[in-house]
Amino acid sequence: MMYRLSILCCLLFLISCKNSDKAVEQMDEIAILETTYKSNPTLENFNLLLQKLGSNILEEGDKTKKEALIIRSIELCKETKNTAYINTFAIELIKLNPKSEVSKTYLLSIAEEMKSSGKNEVANILMKGYTDLYPDDAKSEGIKNSIPATYNNLNGLINDLGTKIFEKPDVNGINKVNAEKYVDVCESYALVYPNDSLSAGYLFKAAEMSRALNSYGKTISLYDWITTYYPNDKNAPMALFLKGFLLENDLKNPDKAKEIYESFLSKYPNHAMSKDVNFLITNIGKSDKEIIEKIEKTKTLPSK
């Protein structure tokens, strides 16, 4: 969720690309890797096990099984005391099941960590969300009293931060610090207010901003958040399309891009962009020159 955690989002995304041609991995593969790691706890074996868990989490469609895999990953990361990895998996758990007791514990822990690290906007949004998600929790009243009154209007606060993206811009036309902060608060809002009508829109704006920052792993994770948890939202088709477009043009992964484009056509066959997506699939991997030549050649063909 927080911007500095995007490295693991990128890691999980790259893993999904490597395994895109496979079905859900068998659980006994995880058991084998886990046994290997326990008998020889090297960083390499840890990474292999974590990658397999990450891959399975991305592919698993059953909510209960996915939750078990996430918790298993968190326990593994606890052994190495890697807070960033723990938090990243914890955030996935909160997305999946925000009302669980485990999610509640991690949400408060992450909020407190953000507060300690000076990310006050993120911390306060998470804490306000905590009090709204768990109003009967014994800690909620005290937390509520610690949140500044400016956070009573979160949408206004987020919009104000959005305007600051272009204050004192750098050579790329944006204020990087404010842009990263905007991404953070949009994610924070969606995490604690998953059912709010504005959440998917905030995630989409955050994805576009992270792409402007060239943080492609983060962008992919945000598009996936939208398509996974908000499949019926108006932003979902565009999020899926832009994921494919980013894969093709920024990450130079035409095979994965084609897979995403085909998924788009399967899910949204009557979408206004279907014709454009078909064109992209037909010409994927071709240079602009080759595409132009093909178009010109088509124009010269006699009409039937």
Ranges and model annotations:
Residues M1-M2:
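N-terminal secretory signal peptides that target proteins for export/translocation
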Residues L5-L14:
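Sec-dependent N-terminal signal peptides
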Residues C17-K304:
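Acidic, polar-rich low-complexity tracts and alpha-helical solenoid repeat scaffolds
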